[in-house]
Amino acid sequence: MAGTGNDNPGNFANRPKEEVQAIASKGGQASHSGGFASMDPEKQREIASKGGKASSGSFEPGSEKAREAGRKGGKASGGTGADDDE
């Protein structure tokens, strides 16, 4: 293995050059088939027409829990904090 000091096998620097080249030669090809893009166009339209309504959702819009989650998310985003109340 390469001398990176990191033995994580997911790190390309730790893999043999030939293996990395084989992976790279696949480019952006998906590692699996399926998902929205491979669906029948009619099925795609059916799902898309629901516009997120099929999502179970975590919060009732405007609820205190939703506001709290939004505050926490904003703090975790690494913003400047200029608009923070605290």
Swiss-Prot record:
Give the family per the record.
Belongs to the con-10 family.
Compositionally biased residues, Gly residues: 75-86
Q: Where does the UniProt annotation place the signal sequence?
A: none
* Spans annotated as Disordered: 1-86
Mention one GO biological process in which this protein takes part, according to its record.
Answer: conidium formation
Record keyword Ligase present: no
Comp. bias (Polar residues): 1-11
Which species? Neurospora crassa (strain ATCC 24698 / 74-OR23-1A / CBS 708.71 / DSM 1257 / FGSC 987)
Under Pfam families, the record lists: KGG
Instruction: Return the Low complexity bias intervals.
Output: 49-58
InterPro entries given for it? Answer: Stress-induced_KGG_rpt, Stress/Virulence-Domain
Question: Where does this protein have compositionally biased stretches of type Basic and acidic residues?
Answer: 62-71
Keywords from the UniProt entry: Conidiation, Differentiation, Sporulation
Report whether Membrane shows up as a keyword of the record: no
Full protein name: Conidiation-specific protein 10
